[in-house]
Amino acid sequence: MDINTLIQTLQSAVPQIAGSCCIVNGALMNLTEVQNMGYDGFSMRAKMNMPLKLYKYFPNRPTELIDKQTGKPIKDEITGNTKTINYSIQALRDNTVFMQSPSLFDDVYDSDIGLNYLEYEKARLLEYCIRCEIDVKETMETPELANALMQTIADMINSTGNIDFLFKNTTVTKNEDLSNQCFLLELKNQLYKGKDLGESLRNVIVSDFNRYLQYLQDSFRATCFATTPYSQLMWGGSYADCHRGFCVEYTVLPNDPQYRKLFLNLFPMIYCKVRPNMTEKLVKFQDKEPTMELLWDIYFHGVLRKSIDWAFQNEWRLLLPMERNRTEKDYCVSFFPFTKVFLGNRMSHTARKEVIDICHEKSIPYVGVTRNPDVFEMQECTIKCEDCPYHTNNIPK
């Protein structure tokens, strides 16, 4: 059963079946079974079935350079023109891939872990009440928890004039101590702005929520790969700029120590129809040291999970833990060696020549991609690009 048939089967299935299945590396699997594999089990299965060829599509177009401080394009001092850089050509010259923040991908759900704010608010208020040694129960509703915490805060302000010693219990972890300090600083800041206690507390919880969600999304950076160089949807979209870009073939080397870290951090995407609510499970990890259980939850419910609508990509991802606010250069990572470059069907003569020159320089085989005349498929062109009258004269083929 090919990938398109799998997608149609899952999309047309009754809700009970569709909600329990997923597509992983072109195979239909039970979603619960995949989840129960855990990090180690899923990783081992992925490595057993990993394709030895991976493909990355590049748009091959210039990008304006933006000043991070002003947010404005950087101008050339002499010409006054906006400075640009072609990251696709840079990646081809350097044999690197760019580790992107998933929040910038084209899928609005990408790496978005399902945290419900209302449930988070209640759980967080309960946690802060416990740290203040307030007599509360898990069965209490959000307004009750908020009122109990506000009463304790108000009593401390009235008796001592500050809230520096609001938290009574001994903190267990450094992260918990930091979260307590953040709470106090944010609450003081809100009160100094003239907010009433209720609004101040609400804003603190909102800040907590946004900060934690950002942490979950930014724990890793990713770069994406396909398993075929002939996908019309990949060529025709922004990935290859409507056939004007190129596609690079990489050969995976599982046993080469030089690429061991890359190999171990490559995973197939999990395509399904359902998004679970992870609030209760993830809130308990918020101020704890990261564990393999948390890592798997971020992977399974976040960076490796996408809608079934994207299953045609049959995507593999390289995931690496990387801090935010590093330079662009730091996010460029050396990858497996090139073994072929596929040139887009609509590449201009100038763009094609530039890529071919780099291929000659690095001794990389290259081939043009053309339309199959009999079926709607892309295929290798049998004519060498330099000898092809269509491309030397910019005639569509």
Language model feature labels by segment:
Residues 2-397:
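Partner-binding and oligomerization surfaces adjacent to conserved cores of proteins
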